[in-house]
C-alpha cells in the first residue's frame, strides 16, 4: 500500500474554508459541520491518492501542474492543490463557477 502524503494548507485555503463554513452556517449549522467533515474526508482521500483530482487546463503559467478535486458531497466546492514529492499543498478551496484563471494563488 502506498504511503500517505502530508497535506499542507496555505493561508488562503484556510481563509477560504473559514469563509465557506461561515456562509453555510448562516443557513444551517449542521450543514456547515457536514461541509467541514466532507472537506476533511476529501483531503484524506487526496493524501492517499494524490492524482485523484484532474489537472487543470491552463492559460496562466503559474497554474501549470495544479489539480482540482470536488469536495465529496459538496460538489460546488473545488479544492485546488499541487502534488509535491513528499506532500500535497492545498492552494485554495473555491466555489464552483469561479473563473479559475482569475483566482489568486498568492499568499495573503
Please provide the spans of the model-predicted regions.
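Short, hydrophobic secondary-structure boundary micro-motifs
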Residues: 33, 54-58, 102
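A short, surface-exposed loop/turn module that caps and links secondary-structure elements
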Residues: 45-72
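Enriched for short, Lys/Arg-rich terminal
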Residues: 71-108
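Generic alpha-helical structural context detector
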Residues: 41-44, 92
Amino acid at each position: 500500500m502506498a504511503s500517505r502524503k502530508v497535506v499542507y494548507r496555505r493561508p488562503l485555503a484556510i481563509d477560504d474554508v473559514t469563509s465557506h463554513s461561515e456562509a453555510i452556517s448562516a443557513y444551517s449549522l449542521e450543514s456547515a459541520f457536514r461541509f467541514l467533515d466532507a472537506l476533511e474526508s476529501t483531503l484524506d482521500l487526496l493524501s492517499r491518492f494524490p492524482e485523484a483530482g484532474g489537472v487543470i487546463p491552463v492559460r496562466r503559467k503559474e497554474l501549470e501542474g495544479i489539480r482540482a478535486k470536488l469536495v465529496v458531497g459538496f460538489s460546488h466546492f473545488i479544492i485546488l492543490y499541487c502534488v509535491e514529492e513528499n506532500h500535497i499543498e492545498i492552494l485554495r478551496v473555491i466555489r464552483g463557477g469561479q473563473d479559475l484563471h482569475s483566482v489568486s494563488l498568492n499568499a495573503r
